Amino acid sequence: MARPRSLVSPLLSGVFCQCDTVSGAPHSHETPASPSLAAAALAADPCGGLLCGGPEHERRLQILFQELDVNKDGAICINDLAVGLKRLGVHRTELELRKIVKAGDKDQDGQLDFDEFVHYLRDHEKKLRLVFKSLDKKNDGRIDAQEIMQSLRDLGVNISEQQAEKILKSMDKNGTMTIDWNEWRDYHLLHSAENIPEIILYWKHSTIFDVGENLLVPDEFTVEEKQTGMWWRHLVAGGGAGAVSRTCTAPLDRLKVLMQVHASRSNNMSILGGFTHMIREGGFRSLWRGNGINVIKIAPESAIKFMAYEQIKRIIGSNQETLGIHERFVAGSLAGVIAQSSIYPMEVLKTRMALRKTGQYQGVLDCGKKILLQEGLSAFYKGYVPNMLGIIPYAGIDLAVYETLKNAWLQRYATSSADPGVFVLLACGTVSSTCGQLASYPLALVRTRMQAEASVEGAPQMTMSKLFKHIVKTEGAFGLYRGLAPNFMKVIPAVSISYVVYENLKLTLGVQSR
């Protein structure tokens, strides 16, 4: 269903520059049949926009501010904005209104005074102008359906021409099936969204979803985010969210490792039985064995993956700010291989610490020292091959499923709302991550068993292929999925906790929520 067309009154559009961005010619208004007193005052059209600073500039802003200041207290609150815009024929959701006030509220008193209001409009128009130019691929001062399709395609979203025309019609006031600068600006006036590509930015997910396996393809960051330092704030927020999430779900993660290594047909370990065994052997605190090193490795792995991803993007020669789906998969998988190769000894330490018995090691350093002395340096790379092979199905299937779900939602709802909402984001991320884990789980199990070989009494030293054959022969295909139940049990709480902590850390670090 197409988005209802927003009829912007002359009072609103009059506060902006009315010059055509290409020719510089003034853009004429059609005077309404029954204009209000305030609108009539703005009917004259000398260039009085925010950026041009014409003679009518200050007066127009004052009149608009007074119209929106419904209770006449010298400030615009969310309720004033809702009522005032509705009177002027502009309808915004409560969430959009909150974002507008938050974006302009410099003193954080929950409302906009005149100076804050002017600053918000000035800043907003500059952003809108930059976005308009980026979408105007033909450089002719107008955006058509093909340019909308191309812009979204560059960001990994494929929509039909019919869908693009629906988006176009929601902004096209004169029926030309193109959008000029004034139509673009008027439509987005006092709207929290700043661009069509922002639809995509809602769908960033790898920094939010931490389910214990950091194998997702990295998110894209815009040039603006890189220049302003927002990229590292996102990574720090994601790392903090991952640390809290992993700590909260650590008992399930340790149970998964125990079942992967010790469960078999002769030792059919249940979830309840596994927890009982851990508590009896080492007490309640033993449920968190291996969690420390699992949290510590988040920072180096995320940093190395991000840097590798950016370098690989340059090597493959992409001049685009964001990559296509296939390029993202290749670059993301290679970045994952580099990051995992760099921190893989920490993966082995995590497995050994999770499997340790009470008193076996004094800590992570003691564990590493004993492995080095007793097994040699090569022990820190046991299970390396299946781990690397697991990156491809995990990252590929997660990306493919997520993009499929994203496109399905956008095809149906993007013309009525850019924001998919928390539930849709969490649901899509959970489903795609679960599918990725399911596909790569046999490789993950073989990796864990190879990492644990020397710590398990009587365990045979096998290559990856021999271990696969041994498991299938002795336990059947089901043996490749030991520990899958606790692994899936932790997905929903892990994703939910990650999201909540991530959003709160973003606010603390000063990252503006989209």
Curated annotation (Swiss-Prot):
The chain crosses the membrane at residues 235-252, 290-309, 333-346, 383-402, 426-443, 483-502. Disulfide bonds: none annotated. It is a multi-pass membrane protein. Keywords: Calcium, Membrane, Metal-binding, Mitochondrion, Mitochondrion inner membrane, Repeat, Transmembrane, Transmembrane helix, Transport. The keyword Metal-binding applies. Residues 1-234, 310-332, 403-425, 503-514 are mitochondrial intermembrane. GO terms for molecular function: ATP transmembrane transporter activity; calcium ion binding. One of its GO terms (cellular component) is mitochondrial inner membrane. One of its GO terms (biological process) is ATP transport. It is found in: Mitochondrion inner membrane. Ca(2+) 2 binds at D105, D107, D109, Q111, E116. Solcar repeats lie at residues 229-315, 323-408, 420-508. InterPro entries: EF-hand-dom_pair, EF_Hand_1_Ca_BS, EF_hand_dom, GDC-like, Mit_carrier, Mitochondrial_sb/sol_carrier, Mt_carrier_dom_sf. Residues 253-289, 347-382, 444-482 are mitochondrial matrix. Residues 56-91, 92-122, 123-158, 159-194 form the EF-hand domain. Ca(2+) 1 binds at D69, N71, D73, D80. SMART domains: EFh. Its main location: mitochondrion. Belongs to the mitochondrial carrier (TC 2.A.29) family. Calcium-dependent mitochondrial solute carrier. PANTHER family: SOLUTE CARRIER FAMILY 25. This is Calcium-binding mitochondrial carrier protein SCaMC-2. It comes from Xenopus laevis. The gene is slc25a25.
